[in-house]
Amino acid sequence: MSTESMIQDVELAEEAFSKTQGPQGSRRRWFLSLFSFLLVAGATALFCLLHFGVIGPQREEQSSRDFSPINSLALAVRSSSRIPSDKPVAHVVANPQAEGQLQWLNRRANALLANGVELRDNQLVVPSDGLYLVYSQVLFKGQGCPSTFTLLTHSISRIAVSYQAKVNLLSAIKSPCQRETPRGAKTHPWYEPIYLGGVFQLEKGDRLSAEISPPDSLDLAESGQVYFGIIAL
């Protein structure tokens, strides 16, 4: 059935309906036509608003206003990452060629001294007052367990400018062997890492040092195993 025939059928049906209903039916048909026209006009207007983006941007703008704190925080994080830090920082590594001693180097890969920190006489010199994260790690190695009890020690000391006395800030003790040595343990290799870290109030001119014992058990075979550093907070 074609569209023209459908329209003709509708017109004939409306004409027959109007003849049977009289003036009252004609009035009802007029109200029905007006309601249909308003419905079609409203749907067309809504489609145009959606199609031309009149409604969409308002919703997006409202959504952006609702999430403005999150967007501001993300923008602040991105901006702060572009600002270079002027806080003192140091990260020194052990000299792999210094057998039997712990010698710190800053002119190596992954090592640095920045914003006033100095490495002097194997000690880190604090450039300004403030809170600092102080940390260090060492790795010991050995072969088997001797008859005597073995202790491995690692400590970080501070020599303050205010009282010129050496004071331990951090220290740790480990033993690679049990008190009762199991059978066959005298031939097994062992490795023992010790990590130290803490936050301290330091003064300008303070000197920090890291010591170990026994030095001949220090493992310097790989880079990144033995290090010492401070970070201003």
Swiss-Prot record:
Glycan attachment points: S80
Keywords: Cell membrane, Cytokine, Disulfide bond, Glycoprotein, Lipoprotein, Membrane, Myristate, Phosphoprotein, Secreted, Signal-anchor, Transmembrane, Transmembrane helix
Cytoplasmic-facing ranges: 1-32
Subunit composition and interactions: Homotrimer. Interacts with SPPL2B.
Name under which the protein is recorded: Tumor necrosis factor
Residues carrying the site annotation Cleavage: S33, L34, L38, L39, C48, L49, L50, H51, A76, V77
GO CC list: cell surface; extracellular space; plasma membrane
Disulfide bonds: C145-C177
